[in-house]
């Protein structure tokens, strides 16, 4: 099923028992995090806090708190169906030349779908039903969560940040957290290599000293939100990809104070500028690792205007030790990554990012091994192929007979098929998430690859062991009388 806006999605979730309305007053200061965290760990529903203590605006939490709800948000009924989205992205990233006229004709509908999903601009939009400007802009009137006791202050989390670099037609969409430090000022935490930061840096080079326009959308439709965290090919905008997921063009409206375009159906939009040289120390905040991060300097976003629906819903989340909502998102999007990786490395059987590894810091890859050194080629390829894996610290590569998602099986392969000295690959001075305080230098550290595959001649002089397994004939004979044993 496809959803035009967030409210249609919430209506569908409620009809399926996947949304719970909370009428008891719950405080956005710490209490919402505790309620959401308990609910998410139990595999519970999305939560709509209808009466946040001290505020009139409802708060939506745990929207993507299960992989199934992520799949629903992307227009799929089951998590397994996300592989089809991955296959589409794999094709769009690396379209194969047609083998003939018939093949070209068969590929035409795919490209036509992409071209037909260019976003549509509208003049009137729900997100601009109300306009707050100037001195009336006051973030303290909004139920912005303070998530953990040691957090530096309230934090805007599910913020879809829209920017555009000079002379670029395509806008960049990214999700960056924002610490509230004043009635109309937030710290924009974007890393230097992220799209928003790159657009800002380019703007400063082209227009030194001039403010950089930024828009932030809160409560967009699920396809647009999820499109911003999916590995979309550079040639396709996130808005167009959201249209593909939704099956209809993304409707955009131009901001009141800039040429940036935001989702017309969003609940709330923040419009403003980042002024060159206006920075502040951000943090500390608890993050997806389960620890409080160090403070670091980032640009300050000054909000000139807030537009919103007549009765807005504030969409929020929290981050903490996995599982949290980002970990669940990573678990679901894992299914999207598999076809993309297989397009580049057909020998990959499966690819898994365990949520306990913060959804990106450790990867398990199973392959159909074809030659000595094959595992090392795959681990180096994974690190370099998609920027999403630039911060993956550990990669374990093993054979296709091992279930990548069964940690017991992976540990068995690791301890029986690898030698620490021979099979460990280290890469020094490589990019690392600056939130990773375990690295010796902020933003720079090492990576480790472990070859847990069966070894081929040239990799060992030893006679390699053969796994002890029961033959199929014996299994079949026991299956025939198993029920009579009364052991189940």
Curated annotation (Swiss-Prot):
Its EC number is 4.1.1.98. One of its GO terms (cellular component) is plasma membrane. InterPro entries: UbiD, UbiD-like_C, UbiD-like_N, UbiD_bacteria, UbiD_Rift_dom. Mn(2+) binds at residues 172, 238. Pathway: Cofactor biosynthesis; ubiquinone biosynthesis. One of its GO terms (molecular function) is 3-octaprenyl-4-hydroxybenzoate carboxy-lyase activity. It catalyses: a 4-hydroxy-3-(all-trans-polyprenyl)benzoate + H(+) = a 2-(all-trans-polyprenyl)phenol + CO2. Binds 1 prenylated FMN per subunit. It is a peripheral membrane protein. Prenylated FMN binds at residues 175-177, 189-191, 194-195. Belongs to the UbiD family. This is 3-octaprenyl-4-hydroxybenzoate carboxy-lyase. The gene is ubiD.
């Amino acid at each position: 099923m496809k959803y035009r806006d967030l409210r249609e999605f919430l209506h569908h979730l409620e009809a399926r028992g996947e949304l719970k309305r909370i009428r008891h007053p719950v405080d956005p200061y710490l209490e919402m995090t505790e309620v959401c965290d308990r609910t998410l760990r139990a595999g519970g529903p999305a939560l709509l806090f209808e009466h946040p203590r001290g505020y009139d605006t409802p708060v939506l939490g745990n929207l993507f708190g299960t992989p199934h709800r992520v799949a629903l948000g992307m227009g799929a009924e089951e998590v397994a169906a996300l592989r089809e989205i991955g296959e589409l992205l794999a094709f769009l990233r690396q379209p194969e030349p047609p083998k003939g006229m018939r093949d070209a004709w068969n590929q035409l509908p795919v490209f036509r779908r992409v071209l037909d999903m260019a976003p549509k601009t509208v003049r009137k939009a729900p997100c601009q039903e109300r306009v707050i400007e100037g001195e009336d802009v006051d973030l303290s009137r909004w139920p912005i969560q303070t998530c953990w006791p040691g957090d530096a202050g309230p934090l805007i989390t599910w913020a879809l940040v829209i920017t555009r670099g000079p002379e670029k037609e395509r806008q960049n969409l990214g999700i960056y957290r924002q610490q509230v430090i004043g009635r109309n000022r937030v710290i924009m935490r974007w890393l230097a290599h992220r799209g928003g930061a790159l657009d800002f840096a380019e703007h400063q080079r082209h227009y030194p000293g001039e403010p950089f326009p930024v828009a932030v959308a809160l409560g967009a439709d699920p396809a647009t939100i999820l499109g911003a965290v999916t590995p979309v090919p550079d040639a396709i905008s996130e808005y167009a990809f959201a249209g593909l997921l939704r099956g209809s063009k993304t409707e955009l409206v131009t901001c009141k104070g800039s040429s940036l375009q935001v989702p017309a159906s969003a609940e709330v939009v923040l419009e403003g500028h980042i002024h060159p040289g206006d920075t502040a120390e951000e943090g500390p905040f608890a993050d997806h690792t389960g620890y409080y991060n160090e403070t670091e300097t980032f640009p300050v976003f000054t909000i000139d205007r807030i537009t919103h629906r007549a009765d807005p819903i504030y969409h929020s989340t929290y981050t903490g030790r996995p599982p949290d909502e980002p970990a669940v998102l990573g678990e679901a999007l894992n299914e999207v990554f598999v076809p993309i990786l297989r397009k580049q490395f057909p020998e990959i059987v499966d690819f898994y990012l365990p949520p306990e590894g913060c959804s990106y810091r450790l990867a398990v890859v199973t392959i159909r091994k074809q030659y000595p050194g094959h595992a090392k080629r795959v681990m180096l390829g994974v690190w370099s192929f998609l920027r999403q894996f630039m911060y993956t610290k550990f990669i374990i590569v093993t054979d296709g007979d091992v279930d990548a998602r069964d940690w017991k099986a992976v540990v068995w392969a690791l301890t029986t098929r690898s030698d620490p000295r021979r099979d460990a690959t280290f890469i020094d001075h490589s990019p690392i998430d600056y939130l990773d305080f375990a690295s010796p230098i902020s933003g720079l550290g090492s990576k480790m690859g472990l070859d847990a595959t069966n070894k081929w001649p040239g990799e060992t002089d030893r006679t390699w062991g053969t796994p002890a397994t029961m033959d199929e004939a014996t299994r079949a004979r026991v299956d025939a009388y198993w029920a009579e044993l009364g052991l189940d």
